[in-house]
Amino acid sequence: MFSLPSLSSWLPSLPSFEWGSSLFDSLLQGLIGALGVSVLNSLLKVYFFVACVNDPQRQPQKQRLSAQWASLEMLHLAGLTLFLTLIGSRVAALVVLEFSLRAVSTLLSLGKGSGNKERLQLFLVCQFSLGCGLSCGLSFLQEGAPHRSLNLLLSLGLAVLLALGARRLTRHICSLYELHSSQRYCGVCLGLLASQHGMPRLLSRTLTVAFAVSDLAAVALINKDFLSSSEAVRFWTPLTICYTLLVIYMQEEQWQHRFSLQGQVQTVLVRMGGLFLLLMTVGRWLDLLSIFFSLLGELWCLAGIRALIDLCQIQGFPPQRPTVTAAVTAEGESGWTDPCEPRPSTPAPARSAVPS
């Protein structure tokens, strides 16, 4: 008996998912990746705001950071989720590997005891790569799981809690940090006052773990498409050459030009152009479409952190942590003492000799 084919047989196959439940899983992975980027963005905003409060010359930048636009934040989250959902797993893996190689090269080129601003710049420009890494990691860890959608929903719930907590922290700090830190009665604000300079180190360790897992997942996702070792060699050889040339070019550009939004846009265009030319020879046409979505996602992330990029351009910002000697000297010059400390007793004046 004649029967019409199903609707899915007429639809083209899309990268990294099939129609049906796989589309829902890809949407969940993209949303989790976007929420992870939102958490990083909120923590960076807290760090930069506290640094602006501690620097009296940065009042205009502080007012710019404290301006909250919830609708724009939700729009940014929705757009990033869309781009991370549409990008294929193959291109997402390539984006993660390219950024990891560039980050390792940058960190190795820094001198010992320096490079705090360079690390902050890496935190700013890694946002789309972090979203791709989280999506790749989830795709690799949940591959073949019997309850994949349920596991992703649980991961989404955890990501939502973390994102809401980070956003609440940002609103609290931007509105009440100056009052609470001066009157010393809020534990959160006092904790940031004491440990603000340790936030970059904490973020660095967290991102190192995240990208280490993402790199392993990216290599596994790329290698599973090859049927033989010769195909893998034909893909990895030009990829290694392309990435090496890109890293050398990025290092030269970094030393010759200062960090700016325009420079980062040019860097994104060069990176995506290199990947586009590479995938024209060893990739598929759907990979080329994913490169376009990746380009839009990178530009979308840069548009959301314009204020933070402008702060990184300021010479001497963020201020370095004061040393113990400087703090003691400042305390001695101000003449301030703790009211709970016992004050040294002043010697009594000597009695004058009374003539007999």
UniProtKB/Swiss-Prot annotation:
Q: Which branch of life, at top level?
A: Eukaryota
Transmembrane helix listed as a keyword: yes
Q: Where is this region: Disordered?
A: 331-356
Q: Which residues cross the membrane?
A: 31-51, 77-97, 120-140, 144-164, 202-222, 232-250, 263-283, 285-305
Under the cellular component aspect of Gene Ontology, which terms does the record hold? membrane
The compartments listed are: Membrane
Query: Per UniProt, what is one Pfam family of this protein?
Result: TMEM82
The UniProt record lists the keyword Transferase: no
Bilayer disposition of the protein: Multi-pass membrane protein
User: Which keywords does this Swiss-Prot/TrEMBL entry list?
Assistant: Membrane, Transmembrane, Transmembrane helix
Sequence similarity:
Belongs to the TMEM82 family.
* PANTHER family hit by this protein: TRANSMEMBRANE PROTEIN 82
Question: Which protein are we looking at?
Answer: Transmembrane protein 82
- Print the organism lineage: Eukaryota, Metazoa, Chordata, Craniata, Vertebrata
